[in-house]
Amino acid sequence: MRRRDFVRQSCASLLALHAVQRWPLGWGRVRGQAPWLLIPMDDAQTDHLKAYGVAFRAVKRGTRAEWFLNYRNGAFLLPSESVTAKDAALAGVLTEALEEDQLAQIRGQIQGGNMDAVPLEKPPKVAVYAPPNAPPWDDAVTMALNYAGIDFDKIWDGEVLGQKLRTYDWLHLHHEDFTGQYSKFFLNYAGAPWLVDMVNRNRAMAQSQGFPSVPAEKRAVAVAIANFVERGGFLFAMCTATETLDLALAADGVDIAAAYSDGTPMDPNASAKMKWDRALAFHNAQLELSPTIPVYSDIDGHQVNSPERRQPLGSFTLFNFSAKIDPVATMLVQNHRQVIPDFYGLTTSFTRKTLKPSVTVLAEEPGAPWVKYIHGEHGQGTWTFFGGHDPEDPQHQIGDVPTDLSLHPHSPGYRLILNNVLFPAAKKKELKT
């Protein structure tokens, strides 16, 4: 090779090498590309649910990221790193390139409107409370996390009582009965293999932990979860876990379980003896006394398993909050839809009359005596309750086929779930919510 050709080729190689700017952790951006990527979350987005996974993984890599509250329905801003662009492309998530002047215009728009730019600093370590043999489709949050590609661990009673909760930031509860009554299915589904398995598994766990009954063991688990929140943990619960967690917490020294659970009948005066100061969200509820009706109390507004009291499904509406004053509430309601079709669960909704005054209502069915989505603080941490079981399976009958989220990539109900996963990553500042 001639010296001239060698020099020309060497210079070309050096130029190609220096065309890649190195960002933190070694992720490269090719010179000439726009410096920023916007992940829009309005109707332009091709996969709303997987967009959360792209943002979560970017933050996990140490990438600087921001959540643009109320701008394009909760868009994400990320540096234009090659690994992020590739991740988004493989996930089928739409990104838009931004130049510095375009970003400056967006920031001006955010500053002047009911919007805010919230830095995302550290993704939470996520745990999902579920029995060891729970199928992945039995829990909407598990499905959402798997579909979005967000890492999580499954834990159950042994881990909770063994103090492992201290190693996590965010905990999800779903179709769990913390009153220890097997979802009150014991009499109506006696002999069903899935119920027999549930009963045997819970009785074995209670015995292994040294408790005299499943209700006693489940209440201890509920107290441990409340302590997790009090120490600064983030709790997100759906379906029966919302109502039964508070019932278990308030039932200090009160027998609220049917005889098939602990060998003694429920105290007929239990409602008057509940210690509601121990509960997170609810107070002054009236408990269901019948062991044959799979209903716990009048906390649930829809009473889906009581033929005489069952209410039809409607739609619920998300509230608007001030992004700069109430950033937490604003994060939790980011969505490309404000009105969302309702969906049943064993606990579908929360009656207004049983909400503590400190509760923030995030979504309601206008004119109805119940709300759908609520939030509050407990000690140093926060809790969020979302009624219903699966946003894309409104009736949710036992034995229904699993929901395929690839058919629902724009699900507004599942977006609310993923808002809860991501908001603990937001940079903390003085909040009024």
Predicted regions and their residues:
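Alpha-helical scaffolding within the catalytic cores
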Residues: 111-114, 158-160, 368-372
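Serine-dependent carboxylesterase/thioesterase catalytic core
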Residues: 227-230, 242, 246-291, 295
